[in-house]
Regions:
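A general, composition-driven signal for non-globular sequence regions
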Residues: 4, 11-14, 80-81, 103, ...
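Generic structural motif recognizing short loop/turn segments at the entrances and edges of beta-strands
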Residues: 44, 59, 119-123
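Short terminal alpha-helical segments
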Residues: 1-56
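Short, surface-exposed, charged/polar-biased interaction segments
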Residues: 39, 94-97, 126
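Hydrophobic transmembrane alpha-helix bundles
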Residues: 26-33, 66-69, 128-129
């Protein structure tokens, strides 16, 4: 989709990825206590969020976001870069520890929630089933 010949950024996927990273309930259900058919790989989850945020920050989409939204995304990208530069941190055997006790994961989750708020959404706006 375009406006005046410029491609617009589709924010739906970004909001979905933010909400999943921001939700402890989602992470408990799909990372800590997954089923064989419904599970989430934390490494892939972080990577998909990171990629979606980076894409949103591309210059061609600058007009799609308010300055404070871009700032929030930039801060989140920097934190993901800092905390998950070593991807082995996300490939733990104990996902309960990762989700509930790993300071790096918790910090990213909390910032993802703040970023979601920046866009005017709350976790109750999303259905994970």
């Amino acid at each position: 989709m375009q406006i005046n010949g410029k491609e617009i950024f589709k924010k739906g996927t970004l909001m979905c990825r933010l909400s999943r990273m921001a939700s402890l309930e989602y992470q408990d259900k799909y990372i800590v206590y997954p089923t064989i058919n419904k599970y989430e790989d934390p490494s892939k989850m972080a990577e998909l969020l990171y990629t979606e945020c980076r894409n949103a920050l591309l210059e061609q989409f600058e007009f799609c976001f308010l300055p404070y939204e871009r700032d929030a995304l930039r801060v989140l990208v920097e934190l993901i870069d800092k905390n998950f530069n070593d991807r082995s941190l996300l490939e733990a055997d104990d996902y309960e520890y990762l989700v509930h006790h790993n300071p790096s994961w918790i910090e990213v989750r909390e910032l993802a929630l703040k970023t979601l708020y920046t866009f005017g959404y709350d976790l109750e706006d999303f259905d994970y089933d």
